[in-house]
Amino acid sequence: MVHEAPHASSFQMLLQLLLLLLLRAEPLRSAELTFELPDNAKQCFHEEVEQGVKFSLDYQVITGGHYDVDCYVEDPRGNVIYRETKKQYDSFTYKTEAKGVYRFCFSNEFSTFSHKTVYFDFQVGDEPPILPDMGNRVTALTQMESACVTIHEALKTVIDSQTHYRLREAQDRARAEDLNSRVSYWSVGETIALFVVSFSQVLLLKSFFTEKRPVNRAVHS
């Protein structure tokens, strides 16, 4: 008879409980998008939000120009509740005072030739507890429940870190490609200039060693 190790059985139970809790948890209403913003252009997004609900907006310019963009948020009445100009990145959190469609816009109208790539993450509402009635419980969490909560928080941290590093990698790659293009153009320009200078020197040296013979003209009387 083969006996299963106690720690292996506990680990399987922990995974099953964590899976059930993740399936029961209601996700946040969120939108995560990376889009192109041409020069002299503005892009707006709309989201209907209930009254008394908190929403948050995080954005960052990945590529283009000085990595800056104008951003503003309007409530359903048309009042501007957030406005920033030429920001590389920022975060904004707001608790709604009225139900309706909220609009947030990104503007690149101040730029005449710089094409931008913008990332934003828009979340509505608070994250529900991973365990039911977690805030109203009288008894303490069991060891397995505490482990599930810890794993859930660690997974959230991993997701946030991956998003951060993915944006940093995209931004660094864009800068490296831009630098590579500039170095390539500079190298081509130097090559052409070197060729022109070398050809001019050859012609100049050739003129030094070319014998100039006087032309004798016969004078007829």
Swiss-Prot record:
Motif (COPII vesicle coat-binding): 208-209
Signal peptide positions (record): 1-25
Short motif COPI vesicle coat-binding, span: 208-221
InterPro entries: Emp24-like, GOLD_dom, GOLD_dom_sf
Source organism superkingdom: Eukaryota
Keywords linked to the UniProt accession: Cytoplasmic vesicle, Endoplasmic reticulum, Golgi apparatus, Membrane, Methylation, Protein transport, Signal, Transmembrane, Transmembrane helix, Transport
GOLD domain span: 42-124
Lumenal topological segments: 28-184
GO (cellular component) term, any one: endoplasmic reticulum membrane
Cytoplasmic side stretches: 206-221
GO biological process per UniProt: protein transport
One Pfam family matching this protein: EMP24_GP25L
Dimethylated arginine sites (modified residues): 103
Subunit description: Monomer in endoplasmic reticulum, endoplasmic reticulum-Golgi intermediate compartment and cis-Golgi network. Interacts (via C-terminus) with COPG1; the interaction involves dimeric TMED3; however, there are conflicting reports on the interaction. Interacts with GORASP1 and GORASP2.
Stated family: Belongs to the EMP24/GP25L family.
Name of this chain's protein: Transmembrane emp24 domain-containing protein 3
Originating species: Mus musculus
